[in-house]
Design a protein with these regions (language model features):
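Contiguous, well-folded functional domains in the mature portion of proteins
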Residues: 1-213
């Protein structure tokens, strides 16, 4: 089942808050309440940045490529034992001013996903792992390779949104959700050949993170 993709310049999920803030901005402009006009103007610009939804394409035409699902900076690359299987763990931090749209890492199928609704504590808090809002998705490529992706919010008033269904087919770079600020972890097969390193800047739907062996 294919879900209608959000391809507008500004994400549809941002239309309501943007409209409300724009109305208040115009009202305070007409009433010459300059302080409130400035506050609403700044908030309007911030929301435009957060909900921007650019088109992304990759020039890499390789069936084994794994693209980043999120914009941000690579924090670390390490090995981790998941369900008695050693996997590569790639941690990416995305800030509030990074593009918030989440994109499929390759063409394939969503094996499944789950969302834990919660709070949005700082990631350095020891309680964040158990209390913060989190989404975990499993993707399977057309060649049968599988990866896990975990998204967790970080000091954000915006909820994580996932627009996917189990067994849904997705094309490479297809939008599947929204994360305004947080941490994303990609769990890749241990045999995957990495194309990035800690400190690398990545762009969702464009940057190649690794290649399936």
């Amino acid at each position: 089942m294919m879900i209608e993709n959000d391809t507008f310049i500004l994400s549809k999920r941002g239309w309501l808050p943007l409209t409300l803030v724009a109305v208040f901005f115009l009202f305070f402009t007409m009433t010459t309440l300059h302080l409130f006009q400035f506050i609403c103007g700044a908030l309007l610009i911030a929301l435009l940045l957060i909900y921007r939804n650019p088109e992304r394409t990759t020039s890499i035409n390789e069936p084994n490529a794994i693209l980043s699902s999120v914009d941000g900076v690579v924090l670390s690359i390490e090995e981790s034992l998941i369900d008695d299987k050693m996997m590569k763990k790639v941690t990416i931090l995305n800030g509030l001013w990074d593009v918030s749209m989440l994109r499929a890492p390759f063409s394939g199928i969503v094996n499944g996903y789950k969302i834990r609704h919660g709070v949005s504590l700082p990631l350095y808090s020891p309680l964040s792992e158990t209390l913060n809002e989190k989404a975990v998705l499993s993707f399977r490529s057309v060649c049968g390779d599988e990866i896990l992706i975990e998204h967790m919010s970080d000091q954000s008033c915006f909820s994580i949104e996932i627009e996917a269904q189990t067994e849904q087919k997705m094309k490479e770079g297809c939008r599947y959700g929204f994360l305004a600020k947080g941490r994303t972890i990609l769990y890749l097969p241990n045999s995957a050949v990495m194309s990035i390193h800690p400190g690398s800047n990545v762009r969702a739907g464009e940057s190649v993170v690794a290649q399936f062996a």
